[in-house]
């Protein structure tokens, strides 16, 4: 039905957005509920200015709720009572924060209408009940998604071994391709592994099953659609050549991105200057070493540039050459550990965004010395250089900070997805997810 609606309305919904339909639905329901309670119930004599303030407050409410995990499905929690507890806790925290913010705004702008206890209780109860709909098991567990594999035994086993590492695997039923495929209307996916050897099977599928409710995909397309990443082992030369990896920097979309980089980085530099000053004082007090640390990084089209960070390691930590940070790295100072977790050490890089060496969102720039090794072992590594590097990116919000060749390869798979699927809305999602990571103190912590 969803596919039919897309055809009727000519909808071209991005891949990353399709997997977050529930999040968007509950986000907009929460937004509408907040505005209804704030503007309609118990309110009189609303002016345009008051409505505008209420709308801004509703956006902040939804952002706080997202950061606290109120729109999560809590899939990793099996016990429904634990899910309810998590949702209730997140709701109470969000209510407390928005209530405090409302009180602060009333002090600054006395003409505003305060939230009041009745409204805040009504918002909390009604919002909790609506959000609980997504975790209550109203229906039986849906049937597993069937995937029929076409390919030789090695290709099939390789694919199965690859997807077993993802939680998505539990919702799949992997089947061998057969000419006895059920012609039922249930959703099915036919995954074509390998290349030329499967031409007969491919022709048979298109001739006999194209009218059914199924997807016919390559592993490349399936991973992009379901994992929102492009694993390098499924990026064949054919797939590589079928897509134009050159970005038109003169297009309106990329000009808008650059305008946003300049505007937001300038504002953030001003707002974060007190934090940078306080952090600088703490760094100096701890070991009396230099405050800033400068590095050479590789940027757009392989051009090298210099970035500035707040120093988080002991002086002379790299006297034997650059190495990746490790978990519980003894080189990191006490203040440095906090700065890394909150990503405060990255704030001076806003200057690099302002001058055009970096973007707010994009692949993280790497050091030339480390890139020598990465390019030797990772195929298509230089593809990440077709766009400006960023302070945060799709890899950073989806994959823990890595410290190995394998981690770099996994991060590249997310970066290639970002390059192929770039949009203003995807940048906005990454920006919000970055705020969530920072608020949860999940900054630069290596996974090994």
List each language-model region with its residue ranges.
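Signature of alpha-helical transmembrane segments in polytopic membrane proteins
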Residues: 1-140
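A short, structured surface patch at a secondary-structure boundary
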Residues: 326-388, 430-434, 438
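Short, glycine-rich, amphipathic interfacial segments at transmembrane boundaries or analogous
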Residues: 223-224, 230-233, 293-331, 392-413
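N-terminal hydrophobic signal-anchor/signal peptide
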Residues: 1-30, 133-270, 448
């Amino acid at each position: 039905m969803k596919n039919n609606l897309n055809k009727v309305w000519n909808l071209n919904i991005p891949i990353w957005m399709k997997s977050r339909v529930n999040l968007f639905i509950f986000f907009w329901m929460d937004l509408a509920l907040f505005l209804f309670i704030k503007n309609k119930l118990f309110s009189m004599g609303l002016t345009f200015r008051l409505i505008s303030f209420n709308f801004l407050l509703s956006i902040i409410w939804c952002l706080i709720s997202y950061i606290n995990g109120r729109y999560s499905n809590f899939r990793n929690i099996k016990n429904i009572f634990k899910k309810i507890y998590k949702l209730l806790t997140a709701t109470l925290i969000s209510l407390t924060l928005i209530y405090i913010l409302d009180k602060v705004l009333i002090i600054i702008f006395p003409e505003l209408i305060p939230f009041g206890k009745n409204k805040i209780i009504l918002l909390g109860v009604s919002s909790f009940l609506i959000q609980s709909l997504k975790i209550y098991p109203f229906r039986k567990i849906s049937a597993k998604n069937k995937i029929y594999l076409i390919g030789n035994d090695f290709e099939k086993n390789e694919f199965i071994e690859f997807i077993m590492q993802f939680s998505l695997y539990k919702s799949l039923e992997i089947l061998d391709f057969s000419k006895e495929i059920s012609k039922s209307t249930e959703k099915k996916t036919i995954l074509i592994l390998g290349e030329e050897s499967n031409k007969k099977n491919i022709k048979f599928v298109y001739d006999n099953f194209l009218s059914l409710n199924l997807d016919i995909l390559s592993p490349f397309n399936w991973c992009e659609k379901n994992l929102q990443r492009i694993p390098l082992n499924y990026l064949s030369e054919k797939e590589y050549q079928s897509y134009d990896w050159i970005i038109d920097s003169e297009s309106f979309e990329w000009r808008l991105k650059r305008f946003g980089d300049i505007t937001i980085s300038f504002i953030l530099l001003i707002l974060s200057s007190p934090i940078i000053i306080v952090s600088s004082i703490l760094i100096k007090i701890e070991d009396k070493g230099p405050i800033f640390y400068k590095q050479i990084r590789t940027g757009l089209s392989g051009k090298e540039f210099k970035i500035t960070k707040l120093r988080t390691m002991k002086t002379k930590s790299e006297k034997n050459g650059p190495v990746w940070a490790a978990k519980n790295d003894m080189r990191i100072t006490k203040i440095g550990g906090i700065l890394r977790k909150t990503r405060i050490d990255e704030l001076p890089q806003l200057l690099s965004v302002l001058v055009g060496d970096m973007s707010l969102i994009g692949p993280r720039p790497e050091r030339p010395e480390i890139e020598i090794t990465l390019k030797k072992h990772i195929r298509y590594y230089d593809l990440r250089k077709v766009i400006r590097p960023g302070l945060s990116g799709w890899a950073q919000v989806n994959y823990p900070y890595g410290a190995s060749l394998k981690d770099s390869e996994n991060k590249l798979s997310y970066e290639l997805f970002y390059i192929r699927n770039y949009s203003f809305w995807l940048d906005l999602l990454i920006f919000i997810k970055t705020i969530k990571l920072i608020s949860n103190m999940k900054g630069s912590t290596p996974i090994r």
